[in-house]
Amino acid sequence: MSDQSARARARLMREALVEAKVGLAQSREARDATSAQLERERTELATVRRRGQLATAINDAETVRLAAEFDRKHSERIAVLERKLAALAQEVALVERETAEMSAQLKRLAGGGDPAAPPPADPDPLPD
């Protein structure tokens, strides 16, 4: 590979790495926002259940009915948010691995190595 094409390839890899890091930051923000939203929904569900119990204790049928309706809605939202949070956590882990791989490839390229080559094996810490 010529020196000029190596520089061009390194530049393209750096640009791709920057885009990946921006995407990683956005994924982390989405994960954190979803986590916060999930906690709010759980708090709301606890409040609704407490109100339903209080309404049951005083025989307020309308409030009991409304509490049951809101319990169902919050429970459904919680289930969706839990799945969403799990998917976002997997996405963040995936993008973190990909970003680390891209960084390693870029370092190998900058060091004059083949970016497609596997990273060098760690030396065996145990002597023979």
Predicted features and spans:
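Extended cytosolic assembly modules
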Residues: 116-128
